[in-house]
Amino acid sequence: MTIFNFTLKGGSSMLVSGPTMAGKSTFVHKLLTSKIFDWQPTNIYWYYGGDTIEGLDGRGYILRQGLPDNFLDVPPNSIVVLDDLMNEGKDHAGLTDLFTKLVHHKNLFVINITQNFFQNSKETRTRRLNTQYVVMFKNPSDVTQIHIIGRQMYPGNPTFLTSVNKNATKKPHSYLFLDLRQETPEDYRVRSHILPHEFPMRIYKQVLDYIHYGKRQAIRKFH
């Protein structure tokens, strides 16, 4: 796997998190028109909350207001976008089935757009643990989320992800991308600039050296 053949895999889900006006929806629109999926989607279903569909008309999406009881009628090889439906979906069992079962059985790609990475319910935690890709947008008002993720991913070097996030999100509307798929090499888990128009892609790696009486320590380096 290299930066030249990077693709998003079918049968996966993505969590896009950040505050209002961070650039989440714009990122998803650009993602959906890019050529970085490893299959050709048959349909794009966009589920939204509230009464507004501003910016969604004319893009070829199949628009749905609110959440259905289940997603059994979504055809295979489709993309499903859940746009800021965290309140409606907090305890929605059908939504959890989408993340844990249907996404794999139907080779779907599910994108969950939310303002809060950590939502306090059993259902949302199950969905989060079954998410393969994470996009964290710059959030000056809450840096604790990236601290917690960093401690979970790199318990031996908990400040690594925090430092990387500062580097990746220096500019407004910037983001950090995490690839949590089982088969992804460790050196390619943390990136930014993944969209084709943003290339060159940036990859953030830990470099391990033997120092201090032979103990292996993690040294931060950005590539």
Question: Model-derived features: where do they sit?
Answer:
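Pre-Walker A adenine-sensing motif
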Residues: 1-8
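Surface-exposed acidic, glycine-flexible loop patches that form ligand/cofactor-binding
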Residues: 5, 36-38
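Conserved P-loop NTPase motor module
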Residues: 10-14, 171-223
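Conserved P-loop NTPase motor cores
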Residues: 11-36, 49-52, 62-159
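Short, structured coil segments at secondary-structure junctions
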Residues: 40, 57-59, 130
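Conserved catalytic segments around the Walker B and adjacent sensor/switch elements
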Residues: 40-47
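A structural signal for isolated positions on well-ordered beta-strands in alpha/beta enzyme cores
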Residues: 45, 109-111, 176
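Helix-rich interaction surfaces within compact, conserved domain-sized segments
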Residues: 145-191
